[in-house]
Amino acid sequence: YVFGNMNEDDLAVGVRDSVEEDENKRNKADFVLWFTKSKFDSQELKWESPWGVGYPGWHIECSCISYKHCGEYLDIHCGGIDNAFPHHTNEIAQSEAYLGHKWCNYWFHVHHLNTNSGKMSKSKGEFLTVSLLESKGYDPVIYRFFCLLSHYRKSLVFSYENLDNAKGAYEKLVAKIAQLLKAEQGEVDKAAYDKLREGFTAAMDNDINTSLAITALYDVLKADTTPATKLALIADFDKVLSLSLIEKAKAVNEKPADTNDELPAEILELAEQRKQARCLLYTSDAADEAR
């Protein structure tokens, strides 16, 4: 049991109401590679095999797909925290028994996305899709930015208010980069570049701490160095973050001038105060910078 330091003697059988103890098991830790006796009355997908007509177990499907498309070795295997046991544990057991060597170097388990009422669950009809966000007018990159502001080992609470706060922070970030693009560039300062890049690299090396990585991005914007240096770093960081920062900033600069100068100064001030008041979201290390 490679995850969670579990002890086989402590495992309980059939604890959930939806799970019955399988009388075909010789050992409580057994799991099925190939079903010849279906759990389901209406099982339709079946194939001939050396072991009889049947279908693959849940775990073997994933091992076979990985082996076919990625080969014998995986560097990083991702999944939700609820896949760590038993699914990924069983994947390791069967894959390494077949391959005869270590299969994956790193396992990356992301914690749950929650609502205020608890964990999002497809079975409860409570789940989020990118197409749903797009239908509500959100660019998918906003959701990505929202997720990156929190560490993957922490459960993340989703609400549209929180997403709007992330949207405001992202737009402010892009606006600052847009200003850099319009500034006199100067030369890339190699020493400053290397020093600032160290902060980002250290954050990602620290258990993929994207929250600290975003902080390192804001540090670049505040740094006393040339626009050329800052833009080179932002482009470099975005190879990892995939936030389309330069692309979005260029799009901002290509837009026609807005008509804000036609609005009364009092209205503009109130709008800015309201915008600032809404940015109360983040508890991560990137929070103060995002606000």
Label each PLM-derived region with a short phrase:
Residues 119-121, 127-284, 291:
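Structural preference for alpha-helix termini/caps and helix-kink/transition segments
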Residues 1-179:
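Alpha-helical recognition segments enriched in aromatics with Gly/Pro capping
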Residues 32, 287-290:
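Intrinsically disordered, low-complexity regions of eukaryotic proteins
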